[in-house]
């Protein structure tokens, strides 16, 4: 089948790594792909305007699940957290300084890189809104995060209701 440039790049990189091992082990004499060049096809990032974020925050949603997905998306917008880091976020990761500022201290799951994020009032409000909320993996979790696919589908529907034509996902 056909695959995109980024997928082709990732598969080529994997194959190149295997071939390096093959040369090192003496299974082949030389690396056949040394001169082969391939680059991923980077897509430009999509950003929401302040007005679009406000529309998402203001829209009346009938169902609890829709409101929760919208709120988690807004939280990610104001913190920059990736889906998996949102899913893994627990109350233990939230620290209040002596001056009253709140921060998230944790490590990115994808890279293991430590991070700390100062929480703006909107993010703090969302954390409090979901304290004691049913449907979480366990009570230590901050948000009732479900699978990524259903979150993406739901946020796309909400964006459509708001008249936002940008292709939203948990990556934005």
PLM ranges: what are they?
Residues 18-21, 25, 92:
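Alpha-helix C-caps/helix-loop-beta hinges
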Residues 85-87, 167-170:
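Active-site-proximal segment of tyrosine recombinases
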Residues 10, 17, 88, 153, ...:
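DNA-binding alpha-helical recognition surfaces that contact promoter or target DNA
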Residues 42, 109-128, 136-157, 163, ...:
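C-terminal catalytic core of Y-nucleophile DNA break-rejoin enzymes
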């Amino acid at each position: 089948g056909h695959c995109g440039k980024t997928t082709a790049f990732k598969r080529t990189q994997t194959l190149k790594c295997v071939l390096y091992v093959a040369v090192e082990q003496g299974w082949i004499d030389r690396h056949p792909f040394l001169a082969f060049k391939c680059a991923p096809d980077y897509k430009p990032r999509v950003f929401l305007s302040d007005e679009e974020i406000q529309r998402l925050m203001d829209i009346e949603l009938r169902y609890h699940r829709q409101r929760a997905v919208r709120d988690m998306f807004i939280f990610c917008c104001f913190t920059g957290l990736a889906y998996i880091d949102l899913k893994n976020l627990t109350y233990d990761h939230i620290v209040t300084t002596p001056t009253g500022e709140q921060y998230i201290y944790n490590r990115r799951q994808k890279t293991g890189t430590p991070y700390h994020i100062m929480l703006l009032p909107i993010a703090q409000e969302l954390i409090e809104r979901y304290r004691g909320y049913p449907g979480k993996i366990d009570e230590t979790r901050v948000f009732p995060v479900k699978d990524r696919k259903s979150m993406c589908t739901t946020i796309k529907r909400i964006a459509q209701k708001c008249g936002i034509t940008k292709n939203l996902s948990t990556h934005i």
